[in-house]
Swiss-Prot record:
Protein name: Dual-specificity RNA methyltransferase RlmN
Coiled-coil ranges (or none): none
Residues where S-adenosyl-L-methionine binds: G253, E254, S285, S307, L308, H309, N384
Chain residues that bind [4Fe-4S] cluster: C197, C201, C204
UniProt-listed GO biological process terms: rRNA base methylation; tRNA methylation
Gene symbol of the encoding locus: rlmN
Organism, as annotated: Paramagnetospirillum magneticum (strain ATCC 700264 / AMB-1)
Organism lineage string: Bacteria, Pseudomonadati, Pseudomonadota, Alphaproteobacteria, Rhodospirillales
Entry cofactors: [4Fe-4S] cluster
Predominant cellular place of this UniProt entry's protein: cytoplasm
Residue ranges annotated for the Radical SAM core domain, each copy included: 183-416
EC code: 2.1.1.192
Keyword field contains Plastid: no
Family, as annotated: Belongs to the radical SAM superfamily. RlmN family.
SUPFAM superfamilies the UniProt entry points to: Radical SAM enzymes
Co-factor binding details: Binds 1 [4Fe-4S] cluster. The cluster is coordinated with 3 cysteines and an exchangeable S-adenosyl-L-methionine.
Amino acid sequence: MIQRHLGQPRLIQNGGDAGGVKAVAQKQTQRRLDQIFPAGRGSHANLHSIPTGYACIIAALTENSQRRHCFAARPSLCVAVMDDSKTNLIGLSRDQLIAEMASIGEKPFRAKQLWHWMYNRGETDFAKMTSISKSMHGALAERYVVRRPGVTKELISADTTRKWLLKFDDGHEAETVYIPDADEERGAVCISTQVGCTLTCRFCHTGTQLLVRNLSAAEIVGQFMVARDSYGEWPTPDDGGRQLSNIVVMGMGEPLYNFENVATALEIAMDGEGIGISKRRITLSTSGVVPMMKECGERLGVNLAVSLHAVTDEIRDRIMPINKKYPLKELMQACREYPGASNARRITFEYIMLKGINDSAADARALLKLVKGLPAKFNLIPFNPWPGSEFDTPDIKTTKAFSDILQDAGYSAPIRMPRGRDILAACGQLRSESQRERASLAKARAAAGIADEHHG
């Protein structure tokens, strides 16, 4: 595994070569930093989490619990704190962007120019948008920014899966993963839609991190843009030359509980004059929010994946509490009514194999009965263990026997081998990396008998 900390500063205590930036350490700045980096209070260990583009002055506690300022030695990282008075143009729909330009007296063509530069070229600096007049650069910069989420950490697995820990303007975090195709030089970007998750599926690590908030459209589409930054895929390449060829909305959170922001983000991603990902290359996964499934299909027309994982209400109630609200009968009816579902665009049923819970031959036959008449295919996912999980992974013989029953009935039912397991990027393993680190740090401090009152 390769681990890379991005924007890692060297710590300098008061004095020394920090004098040149002391003026930045005003009370207003400190209050803003406390909002952005609440987890950094009281611990030098979290200094590496400061992303490029944020001010790198933080408040740290000395041994006698007196607050003092520490500075990053890299001047390039000592920049102005985020200006909340400026509107981020990323995440605005075309109509919203046109309205913003109209508010400053500009015609719709200005919005079209900006759209091209932001989403086709990946540009964030107005001064480098050469088709826009120089006189306009300053006017735009006074009111607007083009900003992606900050990258706190990038992890690369032995199998080339890549995971980014992203930090948003308010200090909250989510994870984004690039999953390479096993056979081709391309892959999918798995994006998150919530900080934490509304649901509490018992087999899923993300479900142990309760919902904090929904992500905005900017924070959702921004994840794909961060991935493109990392792989250097700007300007938007032709379909044949794309490594980041697909989007799967399968990260942290339930997308249909944040549908408006998810829809806006995906509409931006699908726009042919920008990022240009075809709807046929986008798959949205839901745990079964029945009332929103039809609207999703009608508005977006993307591929649907359903996190099924059980063939009876009894088992699904146990491992997926959402089933108590939308039981299997209602869920399967919503699947049958999903717009655009056909033999050419089958619904994917995701099925995590849990040893002794849902992995028997009888379960496989019941699954066939459940989807009868539906244009369906299956992804069989051996359970990916995580610390504290209560489930086990079935052996390969059991999993293959399950798959064979489905395939003998004419369905595609590959066994999806875990990708990125060594960096906790596999299915069901996503959870804020820094939250794990803070939990580990808290345990270590407790074991050492050190008070932890300043740790979140």
